[in-house]
Amino acid sequence: QMDNRTPEKVKFLWEAGFRQVVLARELSIREIRKIHEICPEVPLEVFVHGALCVSYSGQCYVSQACFGRSANRGECAQFCRLPFSLVDSEGKVIVKDKHLLSLKDMNQSDELERLLDAGASSFKIEGRLKDVSYVKNVTAAYRQKLDAIFARRPEYVRASSGTCRFDFKPQLDKSFSRGFTHYFLHGRSEDIFSFDTPKSLGEEMGTMKEARGNFLTVAGLKSFNNGDGVCYIDEQGRLQGFRINRVDGNKLYPQEMPRIKPRTK
């Protein structure tokens, strides 16, 4: 991670012999376009999906300083995913035990055409320590979106050959994520953090209406299935979860009844 944020640095790398430059995750689409306009001969690779670093790409040394594990050598200890308390100058606790530095995951799947038009020539999916199902689902989702763009825009040509066929419907919210954000692509925004948990939340399924006996009644946005695992944030702001043994309409019969309040999502 070389923190490639400026046209000057990209131009220097090109003149030094590099033939493709990976841009930093923190750039806006306007900044990407500016780099391409100043350095049109340089193929630019842009991050589009996966985990985000709360520091500038390649400029965080907390993991090395605290744990002796270099983030720039693929050994980040993920210090920014730990819980922290925010205390003011008088010792008053403003926030207690929240994941104040934990960012959501990047998802630019609906911005690919704009990124191509801005000058991106390839896309990068962050996948350190991800499993096979994550790789399969996420790459399939982006492959289909790119193929749809290429079908409409003949001026864009694939660098690879061959075709991909899928026997499933890729869904990005089915794979690990801390929630999604466009990050700084359209400028600074507030909704980029996942304060409650650094773990995967999955897709929103509905709201709990009531608990009675051995079942929960849910106002569902989507259907549940026997054996599903579900999670929720409890009153203390902690991530909890349980497994569903049986589903009967909007009634869920858990393996073990959780302590969950009505109106919990």
Please identify what each model-predicted range represents.
Residues 2-7:
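Gly/Gly-Pro- and Ser/Thr-rich, intrinsically disordered tail segments characteristic of DNA damage-repair
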